[in-house]
């Protein structure tokens, strides 16, 4: 067991004062949790295996700050332990353009995931632990332990109150993730006051019921040995994740310690002075780090981390010689590259092929590419038979003791936990090794996971949502299951691909773009009902996000559509042709990708001087960027047989043609410019 001395106490005091100075300089932030959690941070980081000079080393221990408001603690630790974060960076905390934003963001070396919305971090940590278990089961060999890292997470009462933490923690217990250790900052304070006003459940019993090991540290403010003992004991648990319930005092050392007033506001000047005096620091100086503290962390963290990384590099070099195929595969994954020519396995179709639901075409893609992509790992939120997300030879990701799979399996049974699924996918992606996680549910229920989807986009995790039952085509299940506003919501997010493919070639294009994406997540919205294969579609064209599917010379109108309404627009164009009205049909499967194309190309698809009408059985919000007139559904759906529901809302060839004629008449004589053209 580690023996703690005066240098450890000085290091803890330094962390506390540095975090307080960081918040005070910004005159904004959260000093309370860092003051209470500093001892745990010091002890944990002194035991974690990491290399600050190579923060992306694949076998490093991961640290997730789920209570992201305590980020001054994380920034202090990154600075003290040798990461690329200077005192000047700390002084710029929460300032525009700084490297130290108000909550942890994934881009900073040493920050594993973006946190802040409570409950996301613990769920990300579950994903990281799952990824590690899969990597180890896939590549470890006797004498060659390439992957054995732990994932550690700090979380607070707020995280535990969020429903997502229950979803993720329940799954972690089921999966017996012994590589996951969570330290619960039990300070009994929330923003409104004591937790007793709204939160008095027995957290320990709750986590025991989930299948976790639960350990206790009664004095997290000072008991370094007790914290170290709990972490060491947690690492002995190989078939259960561990929750260390650590009692702390929020704002420890402050005049307002133990109260909610110290949670989210800088300490007053007199409080800072007495705090510094109490911990042996000059009350008139700020951002002071004793050299012996730097030296201590250099000795206990930086030097051992570099040595461990070098040792791993030698081991991997030997591994590549003994297991050349696996070694080359892992090296490729660590470089962030997909296998050469993997896309040649994507299925292609002609208009003579039979009509098939795009969810079924998605299943075909997964079936065709899974052997090519060992980094592909996915599942469904208890909708596998509906989402069609499991390839025939898939092995479930399950604890070996379950008898129904093992950790080398790449199909995840998420249960009915959409929000956790989204955050877990973020964690799997953030782990590294080029993991490509996907998760299936109904499109309408991706909304349950909106918080996780937003963080995917903000962080640049290229996760994939396989979102089936994408419209009123759901039919009898009715408006509770029929998405209306869902795509408009997610299309409004920055940095996300939202695909709604119309046929097999477009489904393949959606997967191609999504799997090749480095920093952008994707939602692939798929139909329940059969759709025809289209004349004029191709993977190459659809990969641009939008293209001319069927053209005529000098069109009177352009019909631009997505998904099931593309084939409907083709039929409407025939109806119009019978009336001597010429219509171009444009398919626009993904706005985001189309917007990335050169303006010249986009204007060739949606040009000036022709009225453009969008056709989509969803909310018309967002279509103003591409169409002069929109035909959609801006009310909730209806229960009934799908063809009857389409007819009820006017989505028939005749209904589309009628509205196209009205659009032509409305804009007749006007000098139209493309909606793509804007002043700025």
Swiss-Prot record:
A Pfam family assignment: Transketolase_C_1
Binding locations of Mg(2+): 157, 187, 189
Catalytic function, reaction form: D-sedoheptulose 7-phosphate + D-glyceraldehyde 3-phosphate = aldehydo-D-ribose 5-phosphate + D-xylulose 5-phosphate
UniProt: thiamine diphosphate binding residues: 69, 116-118, 158, 187, 263, 418, 445
Cross-link (Glycyl lysine isopeptide (Lys-Gly) (interchain with G-Cter in ubiquitin)): 647
GO molecular function, one term: metal ion binding
Residues of the site described as Important for catalytic activity: 30, 263
GO biological processes: pentose-phosphate shunt
InterPro entries: THDP-binding, Transketo_C/PFOR_II, Transketolase-like_C_2, Transketolase-like_Pyr-bd, Transketolase_bac-like, Transketolase_BS, Transketolase_CS, Transketolase_fam
Result, substituting residue 382 to A/R: Severe loss of activity
Impact noted for substituting residue 103 to A/N: Reduces activity by over 96% and decreases affinity for thiamine pyrophosphate and xylulose 5-phosphate
The family this protein is said to belong to: Belongs to the transketolase family.
Function summary: Catalyzes the transfer of a two-carbon ketol group from a ketose donor to an aldose acceptor, via a covalent intermediate with the cofactor thiamine pyrophosphate.
UniProt-recorded name of the protein: Transketolase 1
Species of origin: Saccharomyces cerevisiae (strain ATCC 204508 / S288c)
